[in-house]
Amino acid sequence: MTTLICCTDSNYYLPTTNFNYASMKMRIFFFSLLWFIVTGIKAQDIPSVPADSAYGVVSVSVCNMRAEGKFTSGMTTQALLGMPVKVLQYTGWYEIQTPDDYTGWVHRMVISPMSKEKYDEWNRTEKIVVTAHYGFTYEKPNEHSQTVSDVVAGNRLKWEGSKGHFYKVSYPDGRQAYVSKSIAKPEREWRSELKQDAGSIIHTAYTMMGVPYLWAGT
């Protein structure tokens, strides 16, 4: 059945057809059922965390940890390159726990999952610690070569050797690079020189004057 709808502003009539409400209800039911089936399949496809992969190490300079597994969720804290973490669950994002017991969700691209054996091996191996506020690692022992990644203070990389003014290092995900000795040092040496008195802490704080503050930053 066709009716006419009057449009007074333009002074013309538009034909329209009455809705078949029964047909519309069937379509709504069908698409709702299809949506539940698809989401149910997706839920079944989400892998659980195997017992031998319930550990990991951060593989980017700064890893943002969020309250939920999505980019729009608020940041709770940050984890740094080389930090060992426990993997609590995986739903497309990893829920992780840091050594200081903070928990949060991180994107799967920023964590290198490991077996307990490889995780323990990473923790035992000698590390190079970045001491400068910011810098880069390179493909060759030359600052004019291709960069591998950025690094920030506190980042830890596996020490593979030395070449000239550079340390050869490797990442948790297997990448290898060179970092200048001017911005990093062996972890044992760094720890032996570390001062935690009030004067040293204040001095370090002053070196960050003018750096933007980030809520939940590390």
Where are these regions (language model features)?
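Bacterial Sec-dependent N-terminal signal peptides
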Residues: 1-49
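Beta-loop motif signature
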Residues: 48-51, 57-87, 130-159, 213
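Residue-level signal for pocket-adjacent positions within structured domains
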Residues: 60, 132, 174, 179, ...
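Acidic/histidine-rich, surface-exposed loop or edge segments in extracytoplasmic proteins
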Residues: 62-63, 185-186, 208-211
